[in-house]
């Protein structure tokens, strides 16, 4: 039962992250001015990463008996979410107004970390599916 709940939480987070990252954010930048789209994304993504910390943390606890690979991926996933939420995102906010070139560099790093988070989440989902 615990693993099914972990699977549900991770699947929800994977769907949410994929939807925001690959549909909502790009669409905002297509239909709104860059500043407006950026203002929306600045509000949405910290909530997304914060929710990820909670969901991935709970799933890590619930799936603690799912093997070393699941735990390793879960710990790395959680660390990357914490890095995004508490280091990268605040750094991006500070740089946007002061050094746009450096902001773009950190934005690229942030996108890479987000992709890694989604892939790690997918890996844990697959582990739980095929473990059954």
UniProtKB/Swiss-Prot annotation:
<protein>
    <recommendedName>
        <fullName>Uncharacterized protein aq_125</fullName>
    </recommendedName>
</protein>
<keyword id="KW-0472">Membrane</keyword>
<feature type="transmembrane region" description="Helical">
    <location>
        <begin position="69"/>
        <end position="88"/>
    </location>
</feature>
<dbReference type="InterPro" id="IPR025423">
    <property type="entry name" value="TMEM205-like"/>
</dbReference>
<dbReference type="Pfam" id="PF13664">
    <property type="entry name" value="DUF4149"/>
</dbReference>
<dbReference type="GO" id="GO:0005886">
    <property type="term" value="C:plasma membrane"/>
</dbReference>
<feature type="transmembrane region" description="Helical">
    <location>
        <begin position="7"/>
        <end position="29"/>
    </location>
</feature>
<feature type="transmembrane region" description="Helical">
    <location>
        <begin position="44"/>
        <end position="62"/>
    </location>
</feature>
<keyword id="KW-1133">Transmembrane helix</keyword>
<keyword id="KW-1003">Cell membrane</keyword>
<keyword id="KW-0812">Transmembrane</keyword>
<feature type="transmembrane region" description="Helical">
    <location>
        <begin position="108"/>
        <end position="130"/>
    </location>
</feature>
């Amino acid at each position: 039962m615990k693993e099914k709940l972990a699977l549900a939480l991770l699947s929800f987070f994977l769907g949410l992250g994929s939807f925001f990252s690959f549909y909502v954010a790009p669409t905002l930048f297509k239909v709104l001015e860059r500043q407006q789209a950026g203002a929306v994304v600045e509000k949405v993504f910290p909530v997304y990463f914060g929710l990820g910390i909670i969901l991935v943390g709970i799933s890590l606890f619930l799936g603690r008996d799912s093997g070393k690979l699941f735990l390793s991926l879960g710990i790395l996933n959680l660390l990357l979410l914490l890095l995004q939420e508490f280091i990268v995102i605040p750094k991006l906010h500070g740089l946007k107004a002061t050094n746009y070139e450096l902001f773009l560099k950190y934005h690229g790093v942030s996108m890479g970390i987000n992709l890694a988070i989604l892939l790690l989440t997918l890996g844990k989902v697959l582990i739980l599916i095929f473990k059954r």
